[in-house]
Amino acid sequence: MAQGQGFGFGLGKIKELQDAFQKAQQVQQGAKVLQEELENMEIPGQSENGLVTVYLSGNQEPRGIEIDPALLSQDLEIVAGSILEAMKVAYDASTETMRSKMEELTSGLNIPSM
């Protein structure tokens, strides 16, 4: 080891480490706010025939379902298929919303490596 070089963990690296910890705290605080926001969302998913709408939170928790009475006169397989289709659409929309919100939260972190 050359004289005066120490372990390579000088003041510059300490400052980077402090910045990284500060950013991590900001993300943690933002994550708490985001969690509440996702819990309070109501994201719809509609079947292709438009007769069923399912609502999920941003955390994919079921919130409600609306079924057009006209669907109930259909064959059971059509009813079940419409419900499943609406659930899948709502789930996809909810997970995409969560992914997008997480990207917003963590964008620009640029945490340095040590």
UniProtKB/Swiss-Prot annotation:
<comment type="similarity">
    <text>Belongs to the YbaB/EbfC family.</text>
</comment>
<protein>
    <recommendedName>
        <fullName>Nucleoid-associated protein MAE_23910</fullName>
    </recommendedName>
</protein>
<comment type="subunit">
    <text>Homodimer.</text>
</comment>
<dbReference type="InterPro" id="IPR036894">
    <property type="entry name" value="YbaB-like_sf"/>
</dbReference>
<keyword id="KW-0238">DNA-binding</keyword>
<keyword id="KW-0963">Cytoplasm</keyword>
<comment type="function">
    <text>Binds to DNA and alters its conformation. May be involved in regulation of gene expression, nucleoid organization and DNA protection.</text>
</comment>
<dbReference type="GO" id="GO:0005829">
    <property type="term" value="C:cytosol"/>
</dbReference>
<dbReference type="Pfam" id="PF02575">
    <property type="entry name" value="YbaB_DNA_bd"/>
</dbReference>
<dbReference type="GO" id="GO:0043590">
    <property type="term" value="C:bacterial nucleoid"/>
</dbReference>
<dbReference type="GO" id="GO:0003677">
    <property type="term" value="F:DNA binding"/>
</dbReference>
<dbReference type="InterPro" id="IPR004401">
    <property type="entry name" value="YbaB/EbfC"/>
</dbReference>
